[in-house]
Design a protein with these regions (language model features):
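Conserved acidic donor-binding segment of nucleotide-sugar-dependent glycosyltransferases
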Residues: 328-330, 334-341, 350-356
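Nucleotide-activated donor-binding/catalytic signature segment of Leloir-type glycosyltransferases, i.e.
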Residues: 250, 257-278
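Short His-centered aromatic/hydrophobic patch
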Residues: 111-117
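Acidic donor-binding loop of glycosyltransferase active sites
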Residues: 213, 271, 288-300, 313
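A short, well-ordered alpha-helix in the C-terminal region of glycosyltransferases
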Residues: 244, 357-371
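Short hydrophobic beta-strand element within catalytic cores of glycosyltransferases
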Residues: 314-318
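Short alpha-helical donor nucleotide-sugar binding micro-motif in glycosyltransferases
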Residues: 277-278, 285-290
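Conserved donor-binding/catalytic core segment of Leloir-type glycosyltransferases
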Residues: 23-25, 207-226, 232-235
Length: 396
């Protein structure tokens, strides 16, 4: 692992942008792919599209200067602090961040993870600089350590991606809901579009003539809340009405052997196809294989539902999680008890019959893009940034 010296980041002699509007502090954006990283990239993509020019400094604890960064811009300056010693990297970032705050006095600091909230609070509060903590999901659903909870409750604002995540975080950590604001995920309508099923993929997965249910999920034994096992248990009932049904599971992980054994024990192993890992750029063609996207899970939000809907694929989710937002409380999809195979089976049969408006490909895509497309996301982000300037110390 390459050690990044302080001199490659923000040296004491360097000048920072005196007109800096915002400072963003994240663990990482480019070192790993995931929901949080994708969400942050959407924020920067929208940030650079604003007609009003903002300038920002971005501090990345675990990313290195050789990261492939498409957001480098004169108005978006990045500082990298990946280091062989995590302690030294954090120390370097803290020193550089303090220097930036002292010199540029930004309007608002955005802390991108609860693990950085104590550092941001420690530096911002004595200087009277308001800070916002961005939360994504499970990292704030349980009671936090005292210092982290204090940093969160002391924030001027908290952003989160769904009402469910807001409610879980507030309940677990005694937060005032008034300072928690919704900043939902976005979907790129140009990247995910409807289209024909590719013959090559149909042949590859043995889906000729099949009604295809699909799930995209990590198959980790410590993270079984995606509901793949529940969908497998529902297959025998679905097959009674649709004998041609098959279930395509995209994703990898150590829980696959258990799921494969479950399918075998239920006599549906010939109906379950484990595709393994599929690269992001190939996902759209796989969504197009599906007649229904099925994930009766417990999500903080569920970007995969938006991806499926943008491809015109009807969706099913659990009924007690953050999917209420992308599915608009059931207006755009089916919501069922997430551990009930019977409920999943009944909903899947309705979806495959295709009579419901929520199965209308064009209508479904239209609704998803209007509410969660990049343009809507950009407008919402700009409104949030403006409100942080007008009322930086929102009432607690």
């Amino acid at each position: 692992m390459r050690i990044t010296p302080v001199t490659e980041n923000l040296k004491l002699g360097d000048k920072v942008n005196k007109k800096t509007n915002h400072v963003f502090v994240f663990l990482e954006i480019f070192a790993h792919e995931g929901g949080i990283q994708s969400y942050i990239k959407d924020i920067f993509r929208a940030y650079l599209r604003f007609s009003q020019v903002y300038k920002a400094e971005v501090f990345l604890l675990r990313d290195s200067p050789d990261s492939l960064n498409p957001f480098e811009d004169e108005n978006l300056k990045f500082h990298y602090f990946k280091n062989q010693s995590p302690y030294l990297g954090r120390l370097q970032m803290a020193a550089a961040l303090l220097k930036c705050l002292l010199q540029s006095r930004p309007q608002q600091v955005f802390c991108g993870h609860i693990n950085l909230a104590v550092l941001v609070q420690t530096l911002c509060q004595p200087l009277g600089i308001p800070y916002t903590v961005l939360t994504y999901g499970k990292e704030v659903w349980e009671p936090l350590k005292n210092q982290e909870r204090h940093a969160l409750t002391s924030a001027n604002r908290i952003w989160t991606i769904s009402r469910y995540s807001r409610d879980r975080a507030c309940l677990a950590n005694a937060l005032n809901p008034k300072i928690v604001e919704m900043m939902p995920c976005a979907i790129d309508g140009d990247k995910f579009t409807p289209g024909c099923k590719q013959p090559e993929l149909i042949q590859k997965y043995g889906l000729t003539g099949a009604k295809v249910l699909m799930t995209v999920a990590r198959l980790w034994s410590g993270d079984i809340y995606k509901g793949v096992d529940v969908t497998i248990r529902a297959l025998p009932q679905i097959a009674q009405v649709f004998p041609e049904v098959k279930y395509l599971v995209i994703g990898r992980g150590d829980d696959q052997p258990r799921l494969a054994k479950l399918a075998k024990n239920l006599g549906v192993s010939d109906r379950v196809m484990f595709a393994g890992f599929v690269a992001t750029e190939e996902l759209m063609e796989h969504y197009r294989l599906a007649d229904a996207y099925i994930m009766p899970s417990q999500e903080g939000f569920g970007i995969v539902y938006l991806e499926a809907m943008a491809c015109g694929v009807p969706v099913l989710s659990g009924d007690d999680d953050g999917s209420a937002d992308p599915l608009q409380d059931g207006k755009l999809g089916w919501r069922v008890p997430h551990r009930s195979p019977d409920a999943v089976a009944a909903a899947c049969i309705e979806m495959l019959q295709g009579d419901d408006q929520r199965c209308d490909q064009e209508w479904l895509r239209e609704q998803a893009i209007a509410l969660f497309g990049i343009d809507a996301f950009q407008q919402h982000l700009q409104k949030m940034l403006l409100s942080s300037v007008i009322d930086p110390f929102k009432s607690k």
